């Protein structure tokens, strides 16, 4: 760094350029021996055609041409171009509007179908909820009947034992849960 800032020896040309551009060169880079003509990116760039401005003489940075005669566009052709472009945009807008209207119509149809299906499913769910409630009541009754049956099964032997302890004249008929028709047959 001392050679760049305050050395009395003459600096190298690269360092002079760097000093003039306020760039400090720390180490010179290595030059690659790359063949640019075979680079695919360069080949693609070379294949791009060059374009000229519509109004020659008004290139970037020029505010007013001095001695050159400007080429002017024919206003009738520009008007035709603009009208054609306007017609094209109008056709595109009509196509988009037609497609949008078709989509809106289809969305409304789908909304109606979904709403109908949703209300049908809600009614079905309510019906199944009622069925589930009735099944729950049946399950509760079944549990109550099982408890009653267990109570009877425990009570009948005690009744028979108590009945057998009574004198024969005071004994009751044997207890049966079956209806009279089943006993007689």
UniProtKB/Swiss-Prot annotation:
Its main location: membrane. It is a lipid-anchor. It is found in: Lysosome membrane. InterPro entries: TBORCS5 (IPR018780). One of its GO terms (cellular component) is synaptic vesicle membrane. The keyword Calcium does not apply. Keywords: Lipoprotein, Lysosome, Membrane. GO terms for biological process: lysosome localization; organelle transport along microtubule; positive regulation of anterograde synaptic vesicle transport. Belongs to the BORCS5 family. PANTHER family: BLOC-1-RELATED COMPLEX SUBUNIT 5 (PTHR31634:SF2). This is BLOC-1-related complex subunit 5. It comes from Gallus gallus.
């Amino acid at each position: 760094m001392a050679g760049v800032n305050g050395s009395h020896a003459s600096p190298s040309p690269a360092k002079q350029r760097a000093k003039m551009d306020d760039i400090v060169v720390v180490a010179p880079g290595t030059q690659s021996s790359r063949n640019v003509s075979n680079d695919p990116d360069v080949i693609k760039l070379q294949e791009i055609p060059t374009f000229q401005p519509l109004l020659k003489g008004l290139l970037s940075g020029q505010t007013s041409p001095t001695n050159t005669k400007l080429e002017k566009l024919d206003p009738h052709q520009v008007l035709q171009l603009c009208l054609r472009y306007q017609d094209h945009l109008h056709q595109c807008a009509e196509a988009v509007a037609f497609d949008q209207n078709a989509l809106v119509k289809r969305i409304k149809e789908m909304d109606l179908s979904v709403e109908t299906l949703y209300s049908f499913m809600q009614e079905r769910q309510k019906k199944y909820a009622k069925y589930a409630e009735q099944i729950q009541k049946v399950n509760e009754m079944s549990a109550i009947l099982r408890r009653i049956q267990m109570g009877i099964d425990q009570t009948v032997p005690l009744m028979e034992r108590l009945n057998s302890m009574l004198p024969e004249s005071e004994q009751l008929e044997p207890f049966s849960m079956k209806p009279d028709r089943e006993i007689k047959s």
